Amino acid sequence: MDNAGKEREAVQLMAEAEKRVKASHSFLRGLFGGNTRIEEACEMYTRAANMFKMAKNWSAAGNAFCQAAKLHMQLQSKHDSATSFVDAGNAYKKADPQEAINCLNAAIDIYTDMGRFTIAAKHHITIAEIYETELVDIEKAIAHYEQSADYYKGEESNSSANKCLLKVAAYAAQLEQYQKAIEIFEQIGANTMDNPLLKYSAKDYFFKAALCHFIVDELNAKLALEKYEEMFPAFTDSRECKLLKKLLEAHEEQNSEAYTEAVKEFDSISRLDQWLTTMLLRIKKSIQGDGEGDGDLK
């Protein structure tokens, strides 16, 4: 069956499902077997949704899954309703990001009501990713990553919570909310430095926190660096700590060339990602004579 044939069959199933729903509302049907009609309609909406999916008509698939979700709720089948809302969200993601968010929020409401916070957290991440990539609303992405982290923490899933919080910190710094970013990086650094499996990552978190301090104030960065070395002696021998000391020296001397050279040397061994490059450029622009710089670190 080609896509047009699948769509035709899906439309017929939708019409049949609507008839079942209307029939369930009549007085006698309501007394005798109204729920059976609604269950049949649920099944038809779901079949229609899957036919629309095969035909790649994502909006129609999302709508059909939504109809099924509402009927499942009418039947007090909370789990099935939430599952259908998630299916609707996944279909809408390909055609209507805002509607996808609405459906996922509906699923989250059901899951939190059922005490299923880990699943709710997962769907908050999906919403955050839609805001990141499709709708480009970073403030809203941050809010959903924070909510996800809260739910994960409540369920003692600290590793998953930290992943979300690191996203929050990275975006907060991009939006120049440096204090918020610093607090998160420091907290996660402190939590990981005593864990034999995770302590290697602690230096990265302290490095990022120090860069945020540096953008705000050079003295803050110096004091923070001393604090991190005291808290986590292994940080002193790290390439990140050595780079920070070189950058502080170059900044104090207002030496743009020395600053660039230190960054180049670090980058030749550990490639700088986009976030680090952005933060290092912001610091470089505060060196006198660099003006707005040439937008380059190399």
Curated annotation (Swiss-Prot):
Membrane topology qualifier: Peripheral membrane protein
Primary location: membrane
Subcellular location as annotated: Membrane
CDD domains on file: SNAP (cd15832)
A Pfam family of this chain: SNAP
Molecular function GO terms recorded: soluble NSF attachment protein activity; syntaxin binding
Tissue: Brain.
Family: Belongs to the SNAP family.
Protein name: Beta-soluble NSF attachment protein
High-level lineage: Eukaryota, Metazoa, Chordata, Craniata, Vertebrata
Gene name of the encoded protein: NAPB
